[in-house]
């Protein structure tokens, strides 16, 4: 156990991107959490805590974090490293990154950054069919958005984990990928470490020892959002070779370009599971991350201690709400937290929210809030990635759709900027999306969570509250040119009118 007295005006970030909306933590914070799954959205984890005063905590193993009575307690039976003297949040991050998760010079594919991504989930749910997917793709093109990465989400296969049998939903996957390629899309398909626990294929991999067994030595059947299933033992090299063989077949014979690797959270594993290579439940997520990292077209939601690596890290499925836990208000702080944990190539979930309601004709529970959808698009527009799912052309009024389209196009216009920042991240470890405190320390910006810095020279200040048409914007020292062409002297706070069709952003004048 390590106890650290929190300094005056000291703020802390870390451990779990899904709790970013609660950050930063300070001397008045009363919270305790482990590295187990976060019911508010697991997202990405790292055994790392960073301070605005240039201090940090690192451990090679999971730990429990407690902030109480002005003291930070790190509870673990393993070694804990406590470092001081890095001066700032940025200094602490860079020191920890260089020592413990240096970036490897690799990035996901450029297309993730230079074009919007599209996902079939909110349109089709688990009813993924050839006709439905092609109709969705054609609508994207017909509505002037242009091609990009297209992800065929969960439910496209007949049985989880087995891709080539009883293909009634998509009887000819090669035909489907060929048609999508003709439209200009790159095609990813949903995969996971979960396998259906019935049938000939299941019996084969069971008998080969590819599945996790519980403490009693029986095949572990775990509950998840689609029922009960077995789980692959990815600590076994033979299991990994089999899975990669399946992926290779999907790529070479069926035209798939890459994979959305879902699930893999700690909740699928137990510390006392019988594995080929014993490890803690939390660490199995790392092995899952290793599985997909070599594919340039990849996407993960669950990650552990994988900072510095070339994976797309998506935020947990968001609700269509203004909330701070799983709504629009979590986007900026959680994305900032991702970057501080070493996950630079981050995607802020689907515009409007990716938590599906299968009872709704439009995939979203309740009525569509057009103001929310617009503000969500604006909040994502100048982040490094944007992912669309539900077709805004069919759920919004003409006026709202035109505003949304404007900011989708703005995202495309900044594609080369995003790509340059991704390449920079791969070499320096610097996040693409940064907090004001990270980039401009010493100005009292620690608790600002409704604006962010793109790279080092663009401040973005979206609206994330319903009915807000005026907002304050903090501008640091220097000269700043607004989206409306107005130049401001920095080291000030300005008040801006923000009608529904405006996103405030400011470029530093060189």
Where are these predicted regions, by residue range?
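Catalytic-domain carbohydrate-binding cleft regions of carbohydrate-active enzymes
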Residues: 2-507
């Amino acid at each position: 156990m390590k106890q650290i007295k929190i300094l005056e005006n000291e703020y802390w970030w870390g451990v779990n991107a899904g709790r970013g909306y609660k950050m930063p933590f300070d001397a008045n914070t009363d919270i305790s959490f482990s590295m187990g799954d976060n019911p508010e959205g697991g997202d990405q984890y790292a055994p790392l805590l960073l301070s605005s005063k240039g201090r940090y905590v690192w451990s090679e193993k999971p730990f429990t974090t407690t902030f109480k009575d002005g003291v930070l307690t790190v509870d673990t039976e393993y070694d804990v490293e406590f470092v001081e003297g890095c001066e700032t949040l940025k200094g602490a991050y860079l020191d920890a990154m260089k020592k413990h998760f240096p970036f490897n010079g690799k990035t996901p594919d450029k297309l993730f950054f230079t074009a919007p991504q599209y996902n079939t989930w909110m349109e089709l749910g688990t009813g993924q069919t050839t006709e439905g997917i092609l109709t969705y793709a054609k609508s994207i093109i017909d509505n002037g958005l242009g091609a990009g990465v297209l992800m065929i989400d969960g439910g496209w296969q007949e049985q989880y984990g087995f891709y080539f049998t009883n293909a009634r939903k998509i009887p000819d996957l090669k035909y489907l990928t060929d048609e999508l390629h003709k439209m200009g899309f790159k095609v990813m398909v949903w995969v996971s470490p979960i396998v259906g626990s019935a049938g000939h294929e299941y019996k084969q991999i069971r008998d080969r020892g590819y599945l996790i067994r519980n403490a009693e030595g029986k095949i572990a059947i775990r509950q998840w959002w689609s029922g009960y299933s077995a789980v692959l033992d990815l600590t076994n090299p033979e299991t990994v070779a089999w899975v990669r063989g399946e992926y290779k077949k999907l790529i070479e014979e069926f035209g798939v370009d890459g994979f959305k690797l879902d699930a893999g959270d700690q909740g699928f594993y137990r510390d006392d599971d019988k594995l080929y290579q014993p490890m803690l439940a939390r660490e199995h997520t790392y092995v899952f991350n290793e599985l997909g990292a070599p594919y340039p077209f990849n996407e993960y939601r669950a990650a552990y201690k994988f900072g510095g690596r070339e994976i797309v890290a998506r935020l947990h499925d968001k609700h269509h709400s203004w909330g701070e836990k799983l709504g629009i208000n979590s986007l900026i702080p959680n994305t900032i937290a991702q970057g501080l944990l070493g996950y630079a190539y981050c995607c802020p979930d689907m515009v409007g929210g990716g938590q599906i309601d299968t009872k709704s004709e439009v995939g979203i529970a309740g009525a569509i809030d057009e103001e929310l959808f617009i503000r969500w698009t604006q909040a994502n527009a100048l982040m490094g990635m944007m992912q669309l799912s539900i077709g805004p052309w069919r759920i919004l009024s003409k006026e709202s759709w035109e505003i949304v389209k404007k900011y989708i196009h703005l995202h495309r216009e900044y594609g080369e900027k995003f790509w340059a920042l991704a390449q920079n991240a791969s070499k320096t470890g610097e996040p693409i999306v940064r907090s004001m405190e990270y980039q401009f320390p010493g100005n009292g910006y620690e608790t600002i969570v409704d604006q962010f810095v793109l790279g080092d020279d663009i401040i973005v200040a979206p609206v994330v509250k319903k009915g807000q048409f005026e907002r304050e914007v903090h501008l640091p020292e220097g000269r700043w040119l607004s989206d409306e062409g107005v130049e401001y002297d920095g080291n000030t706070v300005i008040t801006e009118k923000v009608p529904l069709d405006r996103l405030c952003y400011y470029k530093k004048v060189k």
